[in-house]
Each structure stands twice: as C-alpha cells, then as structure tokens.
C-alpha cells in the first residue's frame, strides 16, 4: 500500500512516490498556483518581520577594502 497525501492546493489525493511527478501537488497547475501564492505573499512563514536598521543596511568598508576596489 502506498502513502497518499492531499494536494495542498486542491485537496486531490496524490500518491507519494517517485512516479508522482509533481508531488505533493496533483499537477503542474496546482504547483504553479501555490508558487504564485508565495510570490504574492498570500502565504508566508510566521515570524517577526525583519527590517534592516540603517547600521546594517550598508556595511562600512575599511580603507584597505576601498583601496582593493580601486585597483580593479
């Protein structure tokens, strides 16, 4: 007996095996719908939102690093 999981997008049962090309999704369409939801931020992983402070936004380069950059 093989393991079956529900497609995260539409709920269709999907056999979990190497033969299931789009697992855990039932189709490429469902896979792309899910990907689009992540890109549009409809889906996300819970946690604190990260906003870089002005100190960490741009690293300060040392005089040595600047000299190396000017050589190129």
From Swiss-Prot:
Pfam families: YacG (PF03884). One of its GO terms (molecular function) is zinc ion binding. Interacts with GyrB. Binds 1 zinc ion. Inhibits all the catalytic activities of DNA gyrase by preventing its interaction with DNA. Acts by binding directly to the C-terminal domain of GyrB, which probably disrupts DNA binding by the gyrase. Belongs to the DNA gyrase inhibitor YacG family. Keywords: Metal-binding, Zinc. The gene is yacG. Residues 44-72 are annotated as: Disordered. This is DNA gyrase inhibitor YacG. Zn(2+) binds at residues 7, 10, 26, 30. Its cofactor is Zn(2+). The keyword Metal-binding applies. Gene3D superfamilies: Erythroid Transcription Factor GATA-1, subunit A. Coiled coil: none annotated. The keyword Zinc applies. GO terms for biological process: regulation of DNA-templated transcription.
């Amino acid at each position: 007996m093989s393991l079956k999981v529900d497609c995260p997008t539409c709920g269709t049962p999907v056999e979990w095996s190497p033969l299931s090309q789009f697992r855990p999704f039932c189709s490429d369409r469902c896979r792309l719908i899910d990907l689009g939801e992540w890109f549009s931020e409809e889906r996300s992983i819970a946690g604190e939102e990260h906003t870089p402070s002005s100190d960490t936004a741009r690293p300060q380069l040392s005089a040595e690093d600047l000299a190396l950059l000017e050589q190129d």
